[in-house]
From Swiss-Prot:
Belongs to the glutamyl-tRNA reductase family. This is Glutamyl-tRNA reductase. Gene3D superfamilies: Glutamyl-tRNA reductase, N-terminal domain, NAD(P)-binding Rossmann-like Domain. The record marks H94 as: Important for activity. NADP(+) binds at G189, A190, G191, K192, M193, G194. GO terms for biological process: protoporphyrinogen IX biosynthetic process from glutamate. The gene is hemA. It comes from Salinibacter ruber (strain DSM 13855 / M31).
Amino acid sequence: MRFYAVGLNHECTSLEQTETFALSAEEQEALYANLSLSADAEVVVLSTCNRTEAYLYGTEADLRQVKALIGQGGGTRWPEETAFQERDEAAVRHLLQVTSGLRSVVLGERQIFAQVKAAYERAVDAGGIHSVMHRLFHTAFRAAKRVSSETGLGRGAASVSTAAVEMARQDLSEAGGEGLRNTEIVLVGAGKMGRLALEALADESLASLTVVNRSPDRAREVASPFGGDTEPWADRHRAVATADLALVATGASDPVLHAPALPAPDEATLVVDVAMPRNVDPAVDERPGYRLYDLDDLEAWTAEVRERRADAVPEAESICEELLEDFVTWVFHQQALQPAIQAIRSTFDTIREQEVDRHAHRTGMDREEVDRLTESIMQKLLAVPIVRLKNVDPESIDFVQGIELLHALFAPSDESDAGRSLAEAPDADTPDLGEAPSRCPYMTHDPGGDGTETEEVQKALRLSAAHQAASHSEEVRGG
C-alpha cells in the first residue's frame, strides 16, 4: 500500500488535453460507483478548471484501475506520456501544495481550497475514504489555512474568476477605454465562479450588468444582490453581442457560445472563457469585433502575479513541509501501533471466546446474545488503554519500548520469538505502509495537536471511572 497522486493539470499538459479528462460531479460519482479497489484502499478524485487528479492510498493494481476509469470518462486511454505521477511523500506534498494554492494558475488563489474540500466530501459520501485519507486531507486543510493566514501568498487576485476580471480590466484599459468603468457586462453562467466574478465587480461603476443562465430563477438570484438584470438563455448570443465584456463560466461540458450564432457586435466585445471544459467555440476569436481569452491566456497573464507573490513561496512551502513531516510521523505511529493493538484485541477475544464456550450453556441466553454482550464488555474495557496508547508521543523512547513490550506480552506464542523489531520504521522517502490501520473512533477529524481529549475519549474515561467506583462499592459492602 502506497500513496499516489496522478493526473493532468496546467503544469504538465495543454488545456485541450486537460479538458478532455474533466469530470462533472455526476461523472465522479459514477467513477466511485464503478471502482472495485483492494481492501483498505482509499481514493479521492479532484476535477477543476485546471486539473483532473486522483489521490490514492492503495496498490499499483488500484492505481491502474483508477487511471483506466478516468480515461474512460474522457473517452480515451490514460495519457501516460503527459500525465504526472507522484508517490509516497512526493504525492502527499503535491496535495498539500495544491490545497494551499502553491500549484494554481493564480498563485495563492483560495478557490482551490473549497474545490479540494468538495472533492473530499464527495469521496466521503461515496465511501471512498477511511482513516488514512481522512487524516491526509485534514492535514491539507490545515496547511491551506496556515498558508493563507501566515503568509502573503494570497494577496491580490484570489481566484481564477477574480484574475479574469483583472485581466479584462487591463485589456479594456489598453484598448483605450476606462477599464471596467461604464462598461456593459454580461455573465453567462450563475455558478460559484460566476458569483466570484460578480463579487470582484461589485465596486465598479458599470453601465449595466446582465446575467444569463439556463434557470431564470437562478439568474435572478445571482443578479439581484448586484443590481443586475437577466436575459433568457435562448437570447445569450444576442446579449453577448451587445456587451463590452462577456464572462463565461457555466458547468456545461460543451460550448454554449457558437461563432456562427453570434451577431456582429455593436462595438468591440471581449469574451473571457474561464470554464473547464471550455464553454466558448474557439472560432469566436476569428469573428470580426470579438476578442477571446481562455484559461491558457489567463495563465500567461498571471505570470506577473506569480512574480509578485514569489517572496511568499518559501514560507508557504515550509509550512507544507512541516505538516508533511507531521503526517508521515502519524503514519509510522499508526503502523507501529497496529500489530500491538491487534495482538491485544486478539488475545482478549480468544479468552472471551473460550469462556463463552465454557459457560454460555449455563446462562440460558442465546449464544449470539452472549457473544454480543461479551464483545461489548471487551470493547469497553479496551477503549481507554487503546486511546491512551494512540495518544503517546511517537518520538519518545517510552513509545518504542512500550509497543515492543505490549507486543511481546500479547502476541501469540508462535510470533513471540520472531525477532520482529517494531522500533524500525520504514524509510521516510518510501513509506510503504503495509495494511492500512483501522479507523480510530476516538480521533478527531481535524486534530489541533493541543493534547486535549476528544469527547469520545472523555466518555470512555467516565465509563471506566464509573466501573471502578462500582467495583470499589461492591468491595466495601462485601468487606
